[in-house]
């Protein structure tokens, strides 16, 4: 990889040995006809193979767009589109040796935006030049320039209020083309909704002649006239911003699967579905459901989106999924509101939480703390804490129960609270190490830390038992929570299947934003997304008796959400510990340092951190790492940042 990076540096300094030729718009010459890997031999480095990526943006706005490219299984690097041709721009990427496949992503800036959300891969020709043509926003690419199609296409269509459709197209409309666009009812394509005006552009806005009723928001299609646009297909108009209205926000409804010995009540939310089906499975490994039950609409007066079903009999520990049929397509996924799941998170599991209470769960009080400024937190990873602790039984090492075997060590450290790195259900194979910041189901404890990951109830019992043991030892428990993104945002994910595009922030054209640096951002400004976070926090407080929360990338969350969190949590636990990171993974900061003033929540003080240890990229040293350091920042931090960004010392954490 060092040779790969060195060759990149050589390439950036080396002028391309190309002769630019003029060509007709439809004539896209191959760089491979004029370029060979041997042309890049310099300073003892030899490129065995080359990848040429041609890139076309209909709007011709190429500034700051670049390629992130990596050999499959290896490290990545950035490359610029530094050459022009009739297609647009292109980059030449050298490889000292030829990997079987190379992955690439086209991005804007330093992950400000992705051109296409998924990784794409190219098989390289050993000892030769591999050349592909990529059009902005399209997942498919071609190695044959004769197959390039630059005709107008719809990238996305979204109903953002009852009368406005946001339309993302590959180029602005030309004069007269607006008359060839129609909005139709999916159930009756002869029923047309008249377009009043079109605000033209790469992102066009269609104003309809009338409001779309709440019952019809997921029934629209957009049709481009074939005579004008050629072989154009109908496009689904997804309900997006329109779903933020109160008509689609049953905020008082309790969602999830609630089990007793007599029956289980299933309640879920999908304001765009025509049909919601419950799929019950015999066991977590079963591939086909044993029963399929249609849910009924359970809408409150004036509100839509709730679905429910009551199934008789004792379903405790029975796996299930939902099938949501919307926009003419079925989408299956685990229940986003579930309280248990199988080991690989592919199935939700019904549980009666009252049957999974360990000894002492109901009568072990949570430790109180006299002053928040006296709290001393110790951050631990469940697996790491006991994995090499020899007195712990082998079967319990790396588990929730393993923590209970060495509580004396925590007392020796003098800490008052344990901060658990994420224990919510995350995407990882059984036994695979993971930090936990890739959450799948937020109300489910991770089975990897249970003594029996194959038993969906084991993680619940054992996490509760661990918390009881820590409380009995006068230690509080704080959960690290990661509500700023999810492990999957696809159409068959827990948050994608019920309401596509609702739970995630998107650009006007429908691409996921990357506020968190992980490829998606949870849209907590939307009522039901905010409700999900609040209900989830209440679940952990009431069902696990935790004592507080540490919010990963708190800066991604809207101030209204943070205020609602403080209100909900403090109502249940007035002494709860709340703190978080006042920054993001690269997106705009919504809740930064200073936003917490007057609220019962603290934020990390990176001013103090950097003054002591230096900055994150190692370009500057701090007080503890070399000569220097901002002594004033250290003094302000020790004083609780009251002369910096806080109103009270309790609003910062060091």
Predicted regions mapped to residue ranges:
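Bacterial N-terminal signal peptides
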Residues: 8-19
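The feature marks proteins involved in alpha-glucan
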Residues: 25-59, 85-161, 209-261, 288-290, ...
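Substrate-binding/active-site clefts of carbohydrate-active enzymes
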Residues: 381-544, 554, 561-573, 577, ...
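Short, surface-exposed loop motifs enriched in S/T, G, D/E and P with embedded aromatic residues
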Residues: 76-85, 189-200, 289-305, 309
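Short edge beta-strand/loop segments characteristic of extracellular beta-sandwich folds
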Residues: 52-58, 66-68, 164-172, 264-271
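Conserved alpha/beta catalytic core and glycan-binding cleft of carbohydrate-active enzymes
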Residues: 343-344, 348-355, 566-654
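Short, surface-exposed alpha-helix to beta-strand junction/turn motifs within ectodomains of secreted
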Residues: 63-73, 166-194, 274-292
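Acidic, low-complexity Ser/Thr/Gly/Pro-rich repeat segments typical of extracellular/periplasmic
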Residues: 164, 170, 174-231
């Amino acid at each position: 990889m060092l040779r790969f990076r060195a060759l990149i540096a050589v390439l950036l300094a080396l002028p391309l040995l190309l002769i630019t030729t003029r060509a007709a718009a439809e004539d896209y010459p191959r760089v491979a006809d004029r370029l060979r890997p041997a042309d890049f031999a310099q300073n003892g480095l030899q490129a065995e193979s080359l990848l040429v990526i041609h890139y076309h943006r209909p709007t011709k706005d190429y500034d700051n767009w670049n390629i992130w490219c990596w050999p499959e299984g290896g490290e990545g690097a950035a490359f610029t589109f530094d050459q022009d041709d009739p297609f647009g721009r292109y980059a030449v990427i050298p490889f000292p040796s030829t990997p079987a496949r190379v992955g690439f992503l086209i991005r804007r800036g330093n992950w400000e935006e992705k051109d296409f959300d998924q990784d794409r891969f190219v098989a390289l020709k050993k000892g030769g030049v591999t050349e592909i043509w990529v059009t902005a926003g399209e997942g498919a690419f071609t190695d044959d320039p004769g197959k390039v199609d630059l005709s107008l296409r719809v990238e996305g269509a979204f109903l953002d209020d009852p009368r406005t459709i946001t339309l993302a197209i590959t180029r602005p409309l030309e004069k007269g083309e607006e008359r060839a666009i129609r909005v139709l009812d999916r159930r009756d394509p002869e029923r047309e909704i008249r377009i009043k005006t079109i605000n033209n552009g790469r992102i066009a806005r269609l104003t309809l002649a009338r409001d779309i009723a709440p019952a019809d928001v997921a029934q629209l299609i957009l049709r481009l006239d074939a005579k004008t646009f050629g072989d154009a297909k109908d496009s689904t108009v997804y309900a997006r911003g329109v779903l933020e209205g109160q008509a689609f926000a049953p905020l008082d409804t309790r969602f999830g699967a609630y089990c007793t010995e007599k029956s289980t009540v299933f309640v879920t939310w999908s304001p765009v579905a025509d049909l919601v089906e419950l799929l019950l499975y015999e066991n977590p490994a079963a591939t086909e459901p044993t029963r399929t039950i249609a849910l009924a609409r359970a809408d409150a007066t004036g509100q839509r989106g709730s679905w429910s079903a009551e199934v008789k009999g004792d379903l405790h520990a029975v796996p299930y999924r939902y099938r949501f049929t919307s926009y003419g397509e079925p989408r299956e996924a685990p229940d986003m509101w579930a309280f248990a799941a199988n080991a690989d998170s592919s199935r939700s599991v019904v549980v009666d939480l009252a049957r999974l209470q360990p000894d002492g769960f109901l009568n072990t009080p949570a430790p109180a703390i006299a002053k928040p400024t006296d709290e001393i937190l110790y951050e631990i990873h469940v697996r790491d804490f006991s994995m090499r602790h020899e007195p712990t039984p082998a079967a319990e090492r790396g588990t929730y129960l393993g923590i209970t075997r060495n509580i004396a060590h925590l007392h020796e450290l003098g800490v008052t609270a344990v901060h658990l790195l994420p224990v919510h259900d995350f995407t990882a194979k059984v036994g695979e190490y993971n930090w936990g910041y890739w959450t799948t189901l937020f109300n489910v404890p991770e089975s990897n830390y249970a003594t029996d990951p194959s038993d969906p109830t084991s993680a619940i019992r054992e996490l509760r038992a661990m918390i009881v043991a820590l409380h009995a030892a006068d230690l509080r428990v704080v959960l690290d929570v990661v509500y700023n993104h999810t492990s999957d945002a696809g159409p068959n994910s827990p948050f994608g299947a019920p309401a596509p595009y609702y739970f995630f922030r998107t650009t006007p054209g429908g691409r996921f934003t990357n506020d968190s640096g992980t490829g998606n951002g949870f849209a907590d400004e939307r009522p039901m997304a905010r409700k999900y976070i609040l209900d989830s926090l209440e679940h952990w407080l009431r069902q696990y008796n935790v004592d507080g929360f540490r919010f990963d990338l708190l800066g991604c969350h809207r101030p209204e959400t943070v205020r609602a969190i403080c209100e909900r949590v403090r109502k249940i636990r007035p002494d709860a510990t709340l703190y978080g990171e006042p920054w993001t993974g690269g997106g705009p900061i919504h809740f930064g340092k200073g936003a917490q003033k007057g609220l019962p929540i603290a934020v990390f003080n990176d001013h103090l951190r950097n003054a002591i240890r230096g900055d994150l990229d190692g370009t500057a040293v701090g007080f503890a790492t070399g000569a220097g350091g901002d002594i004033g920042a250290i003094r302000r931090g020790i004083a609780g940042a009251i002369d910096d960004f806080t109103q009270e010392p309790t609003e910062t954490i060091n």
